[in-house]
Amino acid sequence: MSGDASTPEQDPAQVVADGQQPVETPNDPVETPSASDPGSAAEVSPQTGNNEARLEQLEREHTTLRDEHDVLRGQYMRIAADFDNFRKRQSRDQDDLKIQLTCSTLSEILPVVDNFERARQQLDPQGEEAQALHRSYQGLYKQLVDVLKQLGVAPMRVVGQEFDPTLHEAVLREPSDAHPEDVVIEELQRGYHLNGKVLRHAMVKVSMGPGPQDGASSQPAEAPAADAPAEDSGSGDGNG
């Protein structure tokens, strides 16, 4: 019967001969390109060249970026140093301005302190009312001195000290048997420090050392030199 007849198997060679493609079976070996195959080497070589070129390009870009980083870092360091110096200079200028304003203000107050000092030394209040008024002035003076002390103002102690032009202003000089030369023997106006710096120089009287033995003159020894021509003149007259 035609329906039950099985189709005979076709020979692969016959199939190829008839122009049909052979059917691959799972057991057929897979052809792989050989490393020694010139065709495969030709396919790999361009890819390797592209990778090397890309690597060289990346290395150049890395070098360029590293150089730019070094330049920018140097600029940043200079800008940071300049800003730090500017900040320090501004802070120093502000401190100097503050000190100048403080010194200017305190210099206007010091004459008031001088007046209190003179009043305390000269006044001799008599009677209960005068003494009460004197105590009131002394209380004001003490408050003023305390405020100055809180601001960093301190009086100089100059009597008996060696004369120092950076601290003292010599108003008078006189001979003194009790003090050697260039020693302060009297304070004429008190000097003050402000936080260790001179706020006002002290006006002082300075010793010139012991005077002449006969006490006839307080001038240095220029006077005997003035008498020398007179002695020469007298001897000349005697010879004549």
From Swiss-Prot:
Regions of compositional bias (Low complexity) in chain numbering: 215-233
Where do the segments described as Disordered lie? Answer: 1-54, 206-240
Q: Provide the protein's localization.
A: Cytoplasm
Q: Spell out the GO cellular component terms annotated for this protein, sorted alphabetically and separated by semicolons.
A: cytoplasm
MF term (GO), any = adenyl-nucleotide exchange factor activity
Is Cytoplasm a UniProt keyword of this protein?
A: yes
Which GO biological-process labels does this protein carry?
A: protein folding
Does the record bear Chaperone in its keywords?
yes
InterPro entries documented for this protein: GrpE, GrpE_coiled_coil, GrpE_head
Oligomer and partners: Homodimer.
Query: What is the annotated role of this protein in its UniProt record?
Result: Participates actively in the response to hyperosmotic and heat shock by preventing the aggregation of stress-denatured proteins, in association with DnaK and GrpE. It is the nucleotide exchange factor for DnaK and may function as a thermosensor. Unfolded proteins bind initially to DnaJ; upon interaction with the DnaJ-bound protein, DnaK hydrolyzes its bound ATP, resulting in the formation of a stable complex. GrpE releases ADP from DnaK; ATP binding to DnaK triggers the release of the substrate protein, thus completing the reaction cycle.
Give the family per the record.
Answer: Belongs to the GrpE family.
Indicate what this protein is called per its UniProt record: Protein GrpE
The organism's lineage is:
Bacteria, Bacillati, Cyanobacteriota, Cyanophyceae, Synechococcales
